[in-house]
């Protein structure tokens, strides 16, 4: 009977997260459908909703703080999943933060018109150190269409 090394007992736990990112400015009932899709894709796992900080009078009338407040009031069932993180400015900030929080697999739910763009952009920098920071998700970041 041989002794096993400690390493043979270690198994790295897979920790998955599904997320969405958008302007949501102003929030609409259509956004609730997107949030429903994010939850569905997560299959009971963790999911998060991030809003961009875009703010201009014409296309993005609400500032970030007000937008988060409205999103949480309009969609109370998702209030805990709507992230009001002031440090998030880009999609790279999101994936770096998720990786730093210990997630090993990530899925982004995006509009059908942006799936290819996000898939290419995010996976180009998976496991690459750079100005954007560092993240390394197993198999890259999966990007699925919101429908």
Residue ranges and their predicted role:
Residues 2-147:
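Nucleotidyltransferase catalytic core that binds NTPs
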């Amino acid at each position: 009977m041989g002794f096993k090394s400690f390493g043979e007992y270690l198994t790295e736990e897979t920790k998955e997260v599904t997320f969405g990112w958008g302007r949501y400015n102003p929030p609409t009932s259509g956004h609730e459908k997107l949030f429903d899709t994010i939850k569905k894709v997560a299959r009971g796992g963790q999911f998060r909703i991030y809003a961009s900080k875009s703010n201009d009078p014409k296309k993005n009338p609400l500032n970030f703080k007000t937008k988060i407040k409205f999103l949480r009031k309009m969609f109370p069932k998702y209030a805990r999943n709507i992230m009001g993180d002031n440090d998030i400015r880009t999609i790279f900030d999101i994936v770096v933060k998720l990786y730093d929080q210990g997630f090993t697999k990530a899925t982004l739910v995006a509009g059908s018109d942006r799936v290819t763009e996000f898939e290419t952009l995010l996976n180009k920098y998976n496991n690459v150190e750079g100005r954007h920071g560092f993240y390394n998700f197993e198999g890259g970041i999966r990007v699925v269409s919101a429908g």
